[in-house]
């Protein structure tokens, strides 16, 4: 049996040169990185203040 291979290309009629979409994508990546850092800082604060309670609550919810 012969297998048919299809090469997918993205975007359709768009140009390959980065433009406004590239700048918007960069801004989005920076915003996501900033939000992730803020969330990790918040988790660190909770663990520093109350690590034992955090672990106890995690185990009660089914964590291992």
UniProtKB/Swiss-Prot annotation:
It comes from Rhodococcus jostii (strain RHA1). Residues 21-58 are annotated as: ARC ATPase binding. Belongs to the prokaryotic ubiquitin-like protein family. The gene is pup. Strongly interacts with the proteasome-associated ATPase ARC through a hydrophobic interface; the interacting region of Pup lies in its C-terminal half. There is one Pup binding site per ARC hexamer ring. Residues 1-11 have a biased composition (Basic and acidic residues). It holds the Pfam family Pup. GO terms for molecular function: proteasome binding; protein tag activity. This is Prokaryotic ubiquitin-like protein Pup. The N-terminal unstructured half of Pup provides a signal required to initiate unfolding and degradation by the proteasome but is not needed for pupylation, while the C-terminal helical half of Pup interacts with ARC to target proteins to the proteasome. Residues 24-52 form a coiled coil. The modification Deamidated glutamine is found at residue 64. Signal peptide: none annotated. Protein modifier that is covalently attached to lysine residues of substrate proteins, thereby targeting them for proteasomal degradation. The tagging system is termed pupylation. Is modified by deamidation of its C-terminal glutamine to glutamate by the deamidase Dop, a prerequisite to the subsequent pupylation process. GO terms for biological process: modification-dependent protein catabolic process; proteasomal protein catabolic process; protein pupylation. Keywords: Coiled coil, Isopeptide bond, Ubl conjugation pathway. InterPro entries: Ubiquitin-like_Pup. There is a cross-link at residue 64 (Isoglutamyl lysine isopeptide (Gln-Lys) (interchain with K-? in acceptor proteins)). HAMAP family: Pup (MF_02106). Pathway: Protein degradation; proteasomal Pup-dependent pathway. Residues 1-37 are annotated as: Disordered.
């Amino acid at each position: 049996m012969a297998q048919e291979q299809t090469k997918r290309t993205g975007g359709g009629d768009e140009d390959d040169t980065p433009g406004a979409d590239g700048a918007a994508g960069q801004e989005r990546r920076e915003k996501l990185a900033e939000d992730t850092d803020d969330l990790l800082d918040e988790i660190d604060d909770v663990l520093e203040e109350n690590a034992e309670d955090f672990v106890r609550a995690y185990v009660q919810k089914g964590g291992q």
